[in-house]
Structure formats: structure tokens, C-alpha cells
Design a protein with these regions (language model features):
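Short amphipathic recognition helices of helix-turn-helix/homeodomain-type DNA-binding modules
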Residues: 2-19, 71-77, 81-112
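Hydrophobic protein-protein interaction segments
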Residues: 115-294
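Amphipathic, well-packed alpha-helical segments that form the structural scaffold of globular domains
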Residues: 19-26, 94, 98, 122, ...
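Recognition helix of helix-turn-helix/homeodomain-like DNA-binding domains
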Residues: 35-40, 46-47, 53-70, 80
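An N-terminal domain-cap segment
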Residues: 29-43, 102-118, 122-123
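A short, Lys/Arg-rich alpha-helix, primarily the initiator
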Residues: 1-44
Length: 294
């Protein structure tokens, strides 16, 4: 018996994903007239979405009810275009609609980071860097990442996880100035993993734990948002060096598509660059978050 059927039921996942994507669109977003009529529920009607996708209302209704059996790639592409899905959302829709094909190709496996990758991380001394895997598990890091975010080596392996740190460690709210965005990103990554590995027991357990312990996680999980890890800017606060504005890049590792290398850097000659230099000189004693509570 599955402990968390909501995560593993691909039909329910497909239904909710399509419904939430449809609800976020208004007629004017897709060039349809609205005529000022009041809508009992937000977003496009099913018949409007079916019209945009070029399928019958009955067919789309069956799909939104979770019946994706034998749906063609062309139809999924048309629905993705009608829903204005991002590339990440389009890929997620395909995985949800064709879970049997996915099951044949993927099975959740034990995560290991190659020793050479840790050696590479150790050689990176001027910017924080770490490797993250499925479920937002933190697999390896360098000394400056430990000084910035916390010495994850002091945590139990199961707790070296961004989702647990973000939602269960209150110090993360002090470190991430825009904590809400960080939390939303993390949940969207977990949603992507759930689409790729719907039968991963560790992912199911993680989602179940966070759903019980965090109301904020439950609310974000219900949005069904999905995003790929990418690049951007993070505003952080460190108790010793103050505010930091750091750009980050995510590099997908070629021999394991589930693992990514993340590196943070500051603008040259900025206050943030000076802050990183101070952290590098102080080392792990400067840890801010992610270490066990004292």
C-alpha cells in the first residue's frame, strides 16, 4: 500500500495539473472574447481550451479527468501550446500523461556523487559550490558553501536536503531574504521529480513528512507548479558578513541528469564579493544555517 497516493496516482496528478494550468489563464490571455460575463470558477472553460487545442470538448474532458490513455504526442503538444506551458511544464505534462512509458525507462536509484566531483568542489575556493540531486538532496559541497549555508556534514544524511532545511529549519527564513521564492522553487523541483519518478519511496516519504509538518509546503504543493533549476540572483543575509547579492548558475552533470552543480558568485569589487572573501578566510566556523540546532 502506498503511503502517499496523491504523489503516486498519475491520473490524479494529470487531472490536477491540467486544471490548475487552465485556471491561471483568462480569455484575454489567449485572444478569446470574454463579453464581461461572470465566471463561477477562475480561468478558461474546458470548451475554450478544447477549441484552442483543436480537440473535442469530450476528449479534453476525459484527459483532464486523468484519462491519458493512448493520447498522442501531437495532442499533448497542442494542449501545451493552448495552455501556454513552459518547456518544463510541457515535459511534465508528457510524463504525467504517459506514466507507463516512463516506468519502463526510469526507476529511482540510490544517489551517489563521483569522488572526482568532490575533488573538483574542494578545488573551487573563491565561490560557494555544491551538487544537488533528486529530491533536492545535497550530495557534496565545498568549504565556502559550508561557510555560507551551513556545514551540512554535521547533519544526518537524510537531513542534507534543501526542502527539509527550507521548511523545517526556521533559520533559513533569515538567510534567504526572499524566502517565499526559495520555498516555491524547491517545491517546483520536487514536483518535477515526482513526475519523473512517481514511485520513488523516499520522495513520497519526504512529501508526506513536509505536508504534515508545514502548512506552507501543503499550499505550494497544491499549486502544481514545476520549474527547472536555472540561473538567477539570490539575496542572502549572513549573520557575520551581512547582506549578500549573489548570482547563481546551475550546470546539469553530463553523466547523471538528476545531479546538478550550483555555483554562486558576486559582482567584482562589490560588497558581496568582499563578504565572500571574508567567509572564505573564516572557513566553516562562519556557518549560518543547515547545521544542527544547538
Amino acid at each position: 500500500m502506498d503511503d502517499n497516493p496523491a504523489l503516486l496516482d498519475s491520473r490524479a496528478e494529470l487531472s490536477e495539473f491540467l486544471r490548475t494550468r487552465r485556471a491561471r489563464l483568462q480569455p484575454h490571455d489567449v485572444g478569446l472574447p470574454d463579453f464581461g460575463r461572470h465566471r463561477r470558477v477562475p480561468g478558461l472553460r474546458r470548451e475554450e481550451l478544447a477549441q484552442l487545442a483543436g480537440v473535442s470538448v469530450a476528449y479534453y474532458t476525459r484527459l483532464e479527468q486523468g484519462n491519458g490513455r493512448n493520447v498522442s504526442g501531437e495532442v499533448l503538444d497542442a494542449i501545451a501550446r493552448a495552455l501556454r506551458l513552459t518547456d518544463a511544464e510541457h515535459a511534465h505534462l508528457t510524463r504525467l500523461a504517459k506514466p507507463k512509458a516512463l516506468k519502463k525507462k526510469r526507476a529511482a536509484r540510490q544517489q551517489h556523487m563521483r569522488p572526482a566531483l568532490q575533488q573538483l568542489l574542494d578545488s573551487i575556493q573563491t565561490v560557494p559550490a555544491y551538487v544537488v540531486g533528486r529530491r533536492t538532496d545535497i550530495l557534496g559541497w565545498n568549504a565556502l558553501a559550508a561557510a555560507l549555508f551551513g556545514d551540512w556534514g554535521e547533519l544526518a544524511p537524510a537531513d542534507r536536503n534543501w526542502a527539509r532545511i527550507c521548511f523545517l529549519d526556521p533559520r533559513s527564513r533569515d538567510v534567504f531574504v526572499n524566502w517565499e521564492q526559495k520555498a516555491s522553487d524547491i517545491v517546483s523541483y520536487l514536483r518535477m521529480d515526482a513526475g519523473c519518478y512517481p514511485n520513488d519511496p523516499e520522495l513520497s516519504s519526504l512529501v508526506g513528512e513536509l505536508s504534515v509538518k508545514s502548512e506552507e509546503f501543503r499550499g505550494l504543493w497544491a499549486t502544481h507548479d514545476v520549474r527547472e533549476k536555472g540561473h538567477g540572483v539570490k539575496h542572502l543575509h549572513h549573520p557575520l558578513v551581512g547582506d549578500l547579492t549573489l548570482s547563481f548558475e546551475t550546470l546539469r552533470l553530463p553523466d547523471d541528469c538528476d545531479q546538478s552543480l550550483l555555483m554562486y558568485h558576486a559582482e567584482p569589487d562589490s560588497a558581496s564579493a568582499q563578504g565572500l572573501r571574508l567567509l572564505a578566510s573564516w572557513g566553516r566556523d562562519a556557518s549560518a544555517v543547515g547545521s544542527p540546532q544547538k
